[in-house]
């Protein structure tokens, strides 16, 4: 069985876009792959964080993943900072990373632009990301297009280490998922839905209550045509709502177009709101149970132990290959 690794930053509540675009696919992937889902809290501190908020976000993210269907018995869900081999290997890989290639990373350029004081961790972030992946002999990494450059570096570092020292690491395959809906902002439907959107009406949080979801969908940008039809170029708002509706219910977009033929946007938006509320309700109920119980800590302890066992074996081989320690 091939291994998949996915890292998730604990930076606030996940959106409906995260769920329909990625988590749903992860739930399906765990049946066919050995999956590691890592809450990358050490990556989060490359920018300033409030410690209490960070702790809260870590637990909230873990609870949402489990509530969404990630099975802690068939997958490994854990917190990065609880497995010290990540930073150990991150440092070892920094020793074979070149400053020039790290400075070329688009995300580093974007995040450091206009900043007077830039954290060195922001520069070396990709070396730690490579360590996250290589520790588990990962075969496949499903990532968005924005992370492809970092993944190419992880591949290069694996090959560089293997050539220079010993053939330790599996060179991972980068997979940009073709499945999974790309959900756009409700207010600017040409932009991806994001939790960092300054306009709160632009995104639906996975923990939004039903009335709030309904209000956001009813205020979603459409057009003046009044026809429910999928046309991404000319009707981005309506097309986005159709994608959301279809992803939540499993009904095809063609069937939904027929269903709302001759009906206005009011009826259509109500249908979308109901579909989203029905999709998120069981997840929210499970989340509330988990966040209040000791079960979540037990699951994260189990995940830490499983991850540590695999990571420990890899780091031992890597240290030996580099000549670190006594034996």
From Swiss-Prot:
Catalyzes the attachment of tryptophan to tRNA(Trp). It is found in: Cytoplasm. Signal peptide: none annotated. InterPro entries: aa-tRNA-synth_I_CS, aa-tRNA-synth_Ic, Rossmann-like_a/b/a_fold, Trp-tRNA-ligase, Trp-tRNA-ligase_bac-type, Trp-tRNA_synthetase. A motif ('KMSKS' region) lies at residues 192-196. ATP binds at residues 9-11, 17-18, 144-146, 183, 192-196. GO terms for biological process: tryptophanyl-tRNA aminoacylation. This is Tryptophan--tRNA ligase. Its EC number is 6.1.1.2. Homodimer. It is an enzyme of class 6 (ligase). A motif ('HIGH' region) lies at residues 10-18. Belongs to the class-I aminoacyl-tRNA synthetase family. It catalyses: tRNA(Trp) + L-tryptophan + ATP = L-tryptophyl-tRNA(Trp) + AMP + diphosphate + H(+). It holds the Pfam family tRNA-synt_1b. Keywords: Aminoacyl-tRNA synthetase, ATP-binding, Cytoplasm, Ligase, Nucleotide-binding, Protein biosynthesis.
